[in-house]
Amino acid sequence: MAMQPSYPAPFGAAAISSSAGQEVASTIRRQFTDADADRIVETPLGEKADSSDTAGPDSEDGIDQEGHDKITALARSLSQISQKSAGPTNTFLDPSSDPELDPNSDKFSSRKWMKNLLHIKTRDPDRYPRRTAGVSFRNLNAYGYGTAADYQADVANMWLKGFGWLRSILGCRNRVQIDILRNFEGFVRSGEMLVVLGRPGSGCSTFLKTIAGETHGLWLDEGTHIQYEGISWDEMHSRFRGEVIYQAETEIHFPQLTAGETLLFAAQARTPANRFPGVSREQYATHMRDVVMTMLGLSHTVNTRIGNEYIRGVSGGERKRVSIAETILCGCPLQCWDNSTRGLDSSTALEFVKNLRLSTDYTGSTAIVAIYQASQAIYDIFDKVIVLYEGRQIYFGKASDAKRFFIDMGFDCPDRQTTGDFLTSLTSPSERLVRKGYEALVPRTPDEFAARWRESAERQRLLADIEAFENESPLGGSKYKEFTVSRAAEKAKGTRAPSPYTLSYPMQIRLCLRRGFLRLKGDMSMTLATVIGNSIMAFIVSSVFYNLDQTTNSFFSRGALLFFAILLNAFASSLEILTLWQQRPIVEKHDKYALYHPSAEAISSMIVDLPSKFLVSVVFNLILYFMTNLRRTPGHFFVFYLFSVTITLTMSNIFRWIGAISRSMAQAMVPSSIFMMILVIYTGFTIPVRDMHPWFKWLNYLNPIGYAFESLMINEFSDRRFPCAQYVPAGPGYEDVPLSSKICSQKGAVAGQDYVDGDAFINTSYRYFSSHLWRNYGIILGFFFFFLAAYIICSELVRAKPSKGEILVFPRGKIPAFVKKSRRDGDLEGAPTFEKQQLDNAGHDSTAAIVKQTSIFHWQDVCYDIKVKGETRRILDHIDGWVKPGTLTALMGVTGAGKTSLLDVLANRVTMGVITGEMLVDGRMRDDSFQRKTGYVQQQDLHLETSTVREALIFSATLRQPASTPHKEKLAYVEEVIKMLNMEEYAEAVVGVLGEGLNVEQRKRLTIGVELAAKPALLCFFDEPTSGLDSQTAWSICTLMRKLADHGQAILCTIHQPSAILMQQFDRLLFLAKGGKTVYFGELGPNMETLIKYFENKGSSKCPKNANPAEWMLEVIGAAPGSHADQDWPEVWNNSPERAQVRAELARMKEELLQRPPPPRTKEYGEFAMPLWAQFLVCLQRMFQQYWRSPSYIYSKAATSIIPPLFIGFTFWREPTSLQGLQNQMFAIFMLLVIFPNLVQQMMPYFVTQRALYEVRERPSKAYSWKAFMLASILVELPWNILMAVPAYFCWYYPIGLYRNAYPTDSVTERGGTMFLLILIFMMFTSTFSSMIIAGIEQPETGGNIAQLLFSLCLIFNGVLASPSALPGFWIFMYRVSPFTYLVSAVLSVGLAGTSVKCSDIEILHVPPPQGQNCSSFLDAYVQMSHGRLLNPEATSDCQVCPVADTDTFLAQVSISYSDRWRNVGLLFVYIVFNIFAAIFLYWLIRVPKKRSRKIKEE
């Protein structure tokens, strides 16, 4: 009897008979054929399978597609392999037992790991039920809605936009249905790969999003039928959400987390409940993470932060692979990849697609991929292809049959053109080739192509196949039940059956909590900055109110201190709105992946923030409470701290709720700023409750800060007697007056008492009652829980604003007629497309206008070294070459070879490092005008969003062409450039943003046009002009460069590995290897024969006939995945006769060119083409135009200048001249200053936008000087802010009634005009202050924080909250340097001076005179001395005294005099001028490259 093989208990079968094992093995062998096993011979990293791998009796060597359909979804990890032995190994418990199964081992084999895992799962199908998701679709029609015209909003027509929006809301506006996808049909079985081909705008992304269920802004026709092997579309995207994933081309991750932490989170969120027995969740997730990272070559990044554009982290390619790994770990059986190879070179793209192939083959998953510039090797990996043409389906079927289908139709595929390029070229009339004799038979329009497809026999077979496929998996059938059972087996205990999530809600919260603390650990800077900043602010505020005395003199100071304390505690969380918006795209992505509820992240984020909130609160409140000598008893301190912490948490919930209900950042920030102002005003300190007007008084009842402030005042004053510090009467002659004839000067005082009762004071002054203390706490808790629930609910339900589809935007009145017509007709392609332009301009040749270049640019022995971590690293190593007029030279190389570095060095754009070698123009050194006389087409398409295409070209031509060229001639040349680039139909279109503006190709053409408009006299540099473009657009760009070269332009162009056809456009090639070493420089020859012969003659393998020479060359030098170089090719080049010929030619060229007479020195050889004043005017004009076309900014500025002043005006409506009325008017002026930070923060982003464009593109091109830029940037703000002063003045000054104070002095007009001047100065100061702060700061958020800090200091030390006499001596300098000191002094004096005070009843002091005296004889001396007023001089009892007789006395108490108003005005103008000069100086100091600090050496 044969011994039974034993298996570890964790696999669910303690022992299994030999016959049972053989039965399993035979079943698997029936499922997997040898042919398919042979097809999968490589791991994702190009590792060859071991042909000597002999399988045991239970291993699965041959795998066919049918078998894969029957294997369970292993999408989290099933890209690995099994082992050689008959029994599987539990790699989760002990991965080190077999190095080939250990992802941390150098011997790890992903294929063996995969086979091992498959073996385990097939042994217990009941425990691990299978789950697959193919898809079929019939009559798929998708559409959106548009309007008859799309025009650019500006300040003038914004109202028309608003009316149109209102009409659409009311249903009065006719919406035009725009068809996007029309009559799509097809099916993809599980385990298959479908490639989606089409040009941008053809509907590729929409098709993928529809399959994946992301249909925001899209509508599906009622007849559309989509099902996923028995599961309906609706159910798949609700109950089974996350099983079909749309992978966008952008990478969105938390930058603070490491790659390992990011992927571990995804693995944990989808860790199934039906794991192998004995394997914990942590073990499972960690092992799966390690396997996938090893598979994708990410193991070395496990502890490296993801990073982003501001935080250093993994490279861009590694970040893209992290996104791919995250999708794999999500375990979805159907994946939609939207251009995920964008920006990758062809070898990296091939590696990515091979990974997908391995996953689908082993797991039975399904992949649908839209891909650009697919090489033949990539295309051949796919099973099926769908070709789209302007929203129509023109083919669906086997990838291997597509080429023959169209060739039989009458089209021709040139030699060496890939199948993918051939199929997409059919959608471009200028590129498709028709076989001879078929010219009248082939289709030409999208509708004709679609009709030919619908009439084809291939389509009839497809329909039959779809019917058979759907009959195999009817809705609700066996596959649906298997899918449901499989999904249920993975769900954790406590998860609802209809829930799409794998984890239960508490588990999701715990998982998000863990990630939240990791994020906090990864970036402690914000927490530390908050703690340090609040500590500093606590010390500053506490020093201002240091050690308050215990007498009635401290009443106002204590109230102001508690007001400041509660506001600082309440608004400590205001920036959480920004934090929420930074993470919102990530949370929404994970919700689509069904990793966790957004509300789970919301709850966890609040919990994660609690420790830092408590720490900040403890530090701030401890310092403030005890330094200022607030009520020093344990009970009262803890009451103070309890209310402070509670209001912090409550306001945090409110700010989070505002962020959650907003669908854009602007929607969140504008209401929050107005909301904060309302809370400040209606707290109860600036205007007491009894003085609030009824139309706004209700706001106090809805203000949680108001309840907290009342409780803090009660806590400080209740049950406490304060010794009187100032009696009435007092002073010389009143020393012997008995106490019975005196009264304390504070509210709530009683005659004859030497103290003031705290309860009486707060009752009289604020109507606060001690019984409200804990009632208020209960109300605050009510606010806390209400907004907590609201935040959680809204975070779950409200989604961010979806992006719009691609549309062109034109200035109003300049929309082309054909655009209007096409949109009325509901045509998706109504916007101009390149093919229409090509047809319209087929006979036009505008390149004749190009001035032929005559200079030769040549370089020899160019080296470039930089310092990296203290060590010198050579980036470029002795590069030789030249660019002659009329030639197109390609610069190629492997990733990291230094292509862009060489381009930057040659273009003189490098600002650090050491450069050696010769770079000459006609044998002479480059002069100051070199950068201006060269065109540099950057890889990034950077343009001002508000400019039109023509305006961008005119700007470049005006500033960069010589000043001697007439302006009319420059404009005429711009028109020629527009024709040359075939941009006539969108020349008036606004650049805009992607999706609402120019598309990718149009932007690239504009980038080229901007450089051509400068009429470069020397040469043009092109940096990756085809990166990220589809093959047809790349072809059009290359043909354009060829055309330019043919007309005399000299062009040097870096390019990622292009197709063979693209390479034929180039004359010469400079190829670099790793380390910046030359591999080849020379002619390409016809069909690249010269290049091929060079490598073949040097010992390389022969180039196959149909191979792409560019890819073959990479394989030869060992740069392609899985390839190895058999010799040192840079060394081969250095020793070759070809290099010797290059060196000889350089020597000859230098000698001959030096014999030419040097050009005469003229103004055209200066750094800039135009004088400074002309640069300034042109820049200023463009900036004014930008502001005019940014109505959201201007109207936000207007709203900030109108709504808060108007609200303040009606809050302090016609304030009387009582003591409280004067204080209210003073606070009305104080509150007007609160709009300052809002205006500042609005301005900064627009400056940063202009500066980024200038520094990245226009400064290196020497278009204009930084002085012109700074002066224009500062000046452009001033008119708008001056304009805003008008509504701010009228909305604030007159409602408050400040003009009435001028009646007694008969100076209403004069003081009204002075007040307007002061508001004007305030607005000008705000503008210039903003420019000064942001001039040298990188990010507007950082600038906003600095401005907020300086604003807070100015607010504290302006003399309102604390008078100069009350300030400690060492803070007097802050009072004197604060600009708000002089602004508040001027505004208060102009607004209040020169009128009498009329005390209200509660402000009148009732003093009993001594017996035998009337009030006049008793108090006349006192009121004259104190500048008060005696109201009843003849009375003999109850003398009524108003402590202040006129407003001048009131102002004198805060050191303000009306006579200083013009001095203050002059000082404010000094501050404005200082801001301007400081902005210019700071920009020069921080951001202008200094020649002496560039550390560049040219020898």
UniProtKB/Swiss-Prot annotation:
Record-level GO cellular component terms = plasma membrane
What residue spans carry the Polar residues bias annotation? 16-30, 80-94
Q: Which organism is it from?
A: Aspergillus fumigatus (strain ATCC MYA-4609 / CBS 101355 / FGSC A1100 / Af293)
Q: Where is the composition biased (Basic and acidic residues)?
A: 31-51
Residue ranges occupied by any ABC transporter domain in the UniProt entry: 166-415, 857-1100
Source domain of life is Eukaryota
Q: What does this protein do?
A: Pleiotropic ABC efflux transporter that confers resistance to structurally and functionally unrelated compounds including azoles such as itraconazole, posaconazole, and voriconazole.
Question: What is this protein's name?
Answer: ABC multidrug transporter A-2
The annotated topology with respect to the bilayer is:
Multi-pass membrane protein
Q: List the disulfide bonds.
A: none
The protein's annotated catalytic reaction(s) are: itraconazole(in) + ATP + H2O = itraconazole(out) + ADP + phosphate + H(+); voriconazole(in) + ATP + H2O = voriconazole(out) + ADP + phosphate + H(+)
Mutant lacking the gene: phenotype: Leads to decreased azole resistance, including itraconazole, posaconazole and voriconazole.
- PROSITE patterns in the record, alphabetically? ABC_TRANSPORTER_1, ABC_TRANSPORTER_2
Q: Where would you say this protein principally sits, based on its record? A: membrane
Q: What does the similarity note say?
A: Belongs to the ABC transporter superfamily. ABCG family. PDR (TC 3.A.1.205) subfamily.
Compartment(s) = Cell membrane
- Span list, region Disordered: 1-66, 80-107
Residues reported in the UniProt entry to bind ATP: G893, V894, T895, G896, A897, G898, K899, T900
Q: Which GO terms describe its biological process?
A: xenobiotic detoxification by transmembrane export across the plasma membrane
Which chain regions cross the lipid bilayer?
526-546, 561-581, 606-626, 635-655, 669-689, 778-798, 1193-1213, 1227-1247, 1268-1288, 1317-1337, 1353-1373, 1466-1486
For this UniProt record, give its keywords in alphabetical order, as a comma-separated list.
ATP-binding, Cell membrane, Glycoprotein, Membrane, Nucleotide-binding, Repeat, Transmembrane, Transmembrane helix, Transport
What are the recorded GO MF terms, alphabetically?
ABC-type transporter activity; ATP binding; ATP hydrolysis activity
